[in-house]
């Protein structure tokens, strides 16, 4: 389970330390790919395989399906953590997410996202603006 928000440095080679609390869940490997809103998404290999099966089963005749498959699969990087618990984010993915020398890693339960700090602040502002909508969603769940 991925929970919490962490700010980490990206070194000159593009390596990013994964939070220690996340590392056990990534012992079998991690897949990093383009996310929504110009962030990156990280998945444990097993969760990625489940998602890939479901997305691959969608009808290829649909333009939306093809675009989703391109977004997820063409930019995906399959990797393992190094001995220091870091991943090497490929240059094309760093450029996509506009990552410099800092990144925010946000846990989202079954996966995590990697954001530029500037974009993450925008996300937090949008969450504040939509708080009443989120309260309604929780009410729909009878929570």
Curated annotation (Swiss-Prot):
Keyword hit for Transmembrane: no
Coiled coil: none
Organism of origin: Roseiflexus castenholzii (strain DSM 13941 / HLO8)
Assembly, per entry: Forms oligomers.
UniProt keywords, alphabetically: Cytoplasm, DNA-binding, Repeat, Transcription, Transcription regulation
SpoVT-AbrB domain: residues covered: 5-47, 76-119
Stored PROSITE patterns: SPOVT_ABRB
Biological process according to GO: negative regulation of DNA-templated transcription initiation
InterPro entries linked: MraZ (IPR003444), MraZ_C (IPR035644), MraZ_dom (IPR020603), MraZ_N (IPR035642), MraZ_sf (IPR038619), SpoVT-AbrB_dom (IPR007159), SpoVT-AbrB_sf (IPR037914)
Protein name: Transcriptional regulator MraZ
